Curated annotation (Swiss-Prot):
Keyword flag Plastid: no
Record-given protein name: Retron Ec83 putative HNH endonuclease
Lineage top rank: taxon: Bacteria
Keyword list, A-Z: Antiviral defense, Endonuclease, Hydrolase, Nuclease
MF annotations from Gene Ontology: endonuclease activity
Single biological process term from Gene Ontology: defense response to virus
UniProt entry tagged with the keyword Manganese: no
InterPro entries: HNH78-like
Length: 258
């Protein structure tokens, strides 16, 4: 999960909220035949460089039906008289389908993730307070560069980076709570489902194949592809692989040359 820097809210959303202060998300989606909804979704995706806000898989630029708009504070928990989570710009994230499109390849709901699993988690655990701020990581408030995660290279599972978590406060919470917030993030979004674990292992396999060739120039070129420009799918996993490898660090900081 990487930081998301949202740009300014679209004026058409501001106008809709002014005219419909209690408007629902469905009402906005259907407003003007859905044209404004599609524009808003594209804006959100552009801010995220077409990566899922939670698991970081690529979002399909050519098929907007493969992309959902997620409400970090689940809109079903928005109460009358309070802030309208349905239309709150800072509450809107672009996410993948969370495994709902994998057919029979993976057992469900065990292999749901992201907002698809969050919704399942809320129902299963009868969650009433659906404001997840300060309970799980919010991509909008993450540090620009962070090391909240590591991962098991055998299983592909994400793990909290405990020593780092204990030094960083997040969302106004003391650093002593960060480890539990990161742990809860993995749980609520099901970031360790087999489907995502397998994808991380595949990325590591690709790296290991390149590293085994002992061609430092080729490895350096791979690292530059991973480490420069816009974030790529599973960028957090790429960053962890680079961070944990001495040769990678040496190639990037210039202490190892070829």
């Amino acid at each position: 999960m990487k930081r998301i820097n949202k740009t300014a809210e679209d004026q058409f959303l501001i106008n809709f909220k002014a005219q419909n202060p209690n408007g629902t998300w469905d009402e906005f989606r259907n407003h003007e035949q859905g044209i404004l909804y599609k524009r808003l979704k594209q804006h959100i995706c552009n801010d995220q460089m077409y990566l899922c806000a939670y698991c970081e898989i690529d979002l399909d630029r050519e098929n907007e039906h493969e992309i959902k708009v997620e409400h970090f504070k689940s809109k079903s928990g928005s109460l009358p008289g309070g802030s309208n989570w349905h239309l709150e710009w800072s509450n809107l994230l672009a996410v993948c389908l969370g495994g709902t499109n994998t057919g029979d390849d993976f057992e469900l709901p065990a292999n749901l993730s992201c907002d698809s699993y969050k919704s399942h988690y809320e129902d299963k655990n009868k969650i009433n307070d659906k404001d997840w701020t300060g309970k799980i990581l919010l991509p909008l408030t993450l540090p620009d560069a962070h090391n909240f995660f590591t991962f098991e290279k055998v299983t592909g599972k994400l793990l909290p980076n405990e020593s780092y978590c204990n030094t960083i406060s997040i969302d106004g919470k003391p650093a002593a709570e960060t480890l539990s917030i990161v742990t809860k993030t993995i749980e609520v979004l099901n970031l360790n489902c087999s489907r995502l674990n397998n994808a991380r292992r595949k990325l590591l396999f690709h790296f290991n194949n390149c590293a085994r060739e002992r061609n430092l120039r080729k490895l350096h070129n791979l690292l530059l592809q991973w480490n420069q420009g816009e974030p790529k799918f599973f960028q957090t996993t790429r960053d962890i692989i680079i961070r944990d490898d001495r040769i990678c660090q040496g190639l990037l900081n210039g202490t190892i040359r070829y």
